[in-house]
């Protein structure tokens, strides 16, 4: 056995990008929601879905079940390409508090016009958005599938440190304290 074979890493321990979810919460239905739908479709190239209000809040004029936002999920290569497109909007910097203990990363973009390659369209207006990144290891499907579900041991889950290292190595992200 040579030295290179001994140093091979276990493929099941690799951290992989599962999905990127883009969300715009408008807070109301109507014309503004349609514009947000159009914007997410332009940015991602995927047909978005409407998010609905979970409960009625009279002060905000939100009804339970009424569409109040738009989201789109990107997987595989489309997710990587989208991340490379939006990370310059935050100057390739993420706060340490953006990472949770389960391999998820979230950050917000204040105005969509900060994304390189997008222009201001007076008909659409300006929207902020949330970008959520989910990192997993091979074998996570056993937790989600319908038949023969099984739990994943804690040692196989993606930790905060592993998520930070993944983002540093693959997307050249600088991590800020706080």
From Swiss-Prot:
Matching PROSITE patterns: RIBOSOMAL_L5 (PS00358)
Source species: Sulfolobus acidocaldarius (strain ATCC 33909 / DSM 639 / JCM 8929 / NBRC 15157 / NCIMB 11770)
GO MF annotation: an example: rRNA binding
Keywords: Ribonucleoprotein, Ribosomal protein, RNA-binding, rRNA-binding, tRNA-binding
Record protein name field: Large ribosomal subunit protein uL5
SUPFAM superfamilies given in the database record: RL5-like
Pfam family, one: Ribosomal_L5_C
Family: Belongs to the universal ribosomal protein uL5 family.
Record HAMAP family: Ribosomal_uL5_A
Record note on quaternary structure: Part of the 50S ribosomal subunit; contacts the 5S rRNA and probably tRNA. Forms a bridge to the 30S subunit in the 70S ribosome.
GO terms for biological process, alphabetical: translation
One of the record's GO cellular component terms: ribosome
Source taxon at top rank: Archaea
């Amino acid at each position: 056995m040579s030295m290179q074979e001994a140093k091979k890493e276990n493929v099941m321990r690799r951290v992989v990008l599962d999905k990127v979810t883009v969300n715009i919460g408008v807070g109301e239905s109507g014309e503004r929601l349609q514009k947000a739908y159009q914007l997410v479709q332009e940015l991602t190239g995927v047909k978005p879905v409407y998010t609905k209000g979970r409960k009625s809040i009279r002060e905000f004029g939100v009804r339970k079940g009424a569409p109040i936002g738009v989201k789109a999920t990107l997987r595989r290569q489309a997710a990587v390409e989208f991340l490379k497109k939006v990370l310059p909007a935050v100057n390739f910097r993420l706060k340490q508090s953006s990472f949770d203990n389960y391999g998820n990363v979230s950050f917000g973009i204040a105005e969509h016009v900060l994304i390189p390659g997008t222009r201001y369209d007076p008909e659409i207006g300006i929207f902020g958005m949330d970008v959520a990144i989910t990192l997993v290891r091979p074998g996570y499907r056993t937790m989600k599938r319908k038949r023969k579900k099984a739990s994943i041991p804690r040692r196989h889950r993606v930790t905060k440190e592993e998520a930070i290292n993944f983002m540093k190595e693959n997307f050249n992200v600088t991590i800020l304290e706080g």
